[in-house]
Amino acid sequence: MKRIFGPALAILLLFVLPLAAQQTGKLVVKADPGRTGVFVDGKYLGPAANFRVARTYNVAAGDHELKLEEPRYEEVVKKITVTANKKTVVAEKLKALPPPKGPFGRLRTESTDKFAAVYVNNKFYGHTDEFSNSSQGLLLPPGEYEVRIEPTSGSPVTQKVKLEADRTVVVK
């Protein structure tokens, strides 16, 4: 019985594993602006591009809701279909919102995951690499905010901050 079970299991795995691998496709989002956040079925995948090169994400085959979000632009939500073992390319130019008026405080973020999502009061604002050094930062009106940094793997960091005009706060 044991001699039959081992080879039967090996044969089964040879057929099942390739079928499981075929259940994903590739998603490429060519968004303008490239720093636009890509969400599939509510889950943040990362920015649309890195240094103007579109990123590719593995996505389960089937119908999905795609949301493109960038705080200075109108968000785009659309239905997409990802086909197993195929590349789905979506191109979108987001419409700019009117620029906000100051004064502003500056929010900086630090994380070991440069593509960790940054949320302010539960709204997506970008990824940590956009706000991570002394010449970068997210400009927000003075006030109190809840900042959440959500890495692609691992636990999110949530911190309440108070921004003052012309001051910088760093969330790690």
List where the protein language model places each region.
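Bacterial N-terminal signal peptides
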Residues: 8-18
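Short loop/turn and low-complexity linker motifs enriched in small/turn-promoting residues
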Residues: 21-172
